[in-house]
């Protein structure tokens, strides 16, 4: 919600409900069970959340031009992760066409410049503050479950790249983003 204030904008009422619902953060016992307890413990670092480096990471990605629904989801997701003691940050929200083409050449994405939700502020890549991209499949699956639970609670239509054939577990995007940006089709 602070991002709306920084931009001098009033958040929509439904996003206010998402940002401050009575049942968020979701209790850890409802969020994590079984074998995922070990995955959670392996990515937790509550003391890191209190440090200057974590604070700086939170401001790393440019939020200019990011879809407000996506920012609302990101804010709620981050609150849930902090409540669980998991330090994460966004590597990129908005990405230039040239940067997209560079990543495609490296094989980290399939989308060409101009055809990615990142070019339109409709996606973000979430990275662990200390482990970076190097999480296990179980750790990413846990993060996917947490993010999808937050989205469901807020009735937000968000897709997770960990569910795709081209596995991209750091990636989150607005579902149906092409319909919201007609010239991207």
Role assignments for model-derived ranges:
Residues 16-59:
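N-terminal low-complexity, Pro/Thr/Ser-rich intrinsically disordered segments
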Residues 12, 37, 67-71:
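Generic structural signal for alpha-helix starts
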Residues 1-12:
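Intrinsically disordered, low-structural-confidence terminal and linker regions
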Residues 12, 18, 22-23, 27, ...:
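Catalytic cores and adjacent binding grooves of peptidoglycan-active enzymes
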Residues 70, 92, 136, 140:
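Charged, low-complexity surface patches
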Residues 78-108, 153:
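Extended, low-complexity, intrinsically disordered C-terminal regulatory tails
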Residues 43-89:
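Active-site acidic/histidine clusters and adjacent loop/turn architecture
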């Amino acid at each position: 919600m602070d991002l709306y204030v920084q931009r001098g904008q009033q958040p929509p009422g439904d996003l206010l409900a998402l940002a401050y619902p009575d049942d968020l953060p979701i209790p850890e016992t409802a969020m994590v069970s079984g074998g995922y307890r070990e995955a959670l413990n392996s990515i937790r670092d509550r003391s890191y959340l209190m440090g200057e480096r974590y604070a700086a990471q939170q401001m790393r990605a440019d939020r200019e031009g990011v879809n407000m629904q996506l920012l609302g989801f990101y804010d709620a997701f981050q609150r849930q992760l902090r409540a669980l003691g998991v330090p994460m940050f966004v590597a990129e929200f908005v990405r230039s066409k040239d940067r997209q083409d560079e990543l495609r050449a490296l094989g980290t994405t399939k989308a060409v410049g101009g055809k990615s939700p990142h070019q339109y502020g409709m996606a973000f890549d979430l990275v662990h503050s200390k482990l970076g991209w190097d999480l296990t499949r179980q750790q990413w699956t846990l993060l996917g479950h947490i993010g999808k639970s937050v989205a469901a609670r807020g009735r937000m239509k968000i897709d997770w790249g960990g569910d795709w054939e081209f596995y991209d577990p750091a990636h989150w995007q607005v579902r149906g983003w092409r319909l919201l940006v007609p010239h991207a089709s």
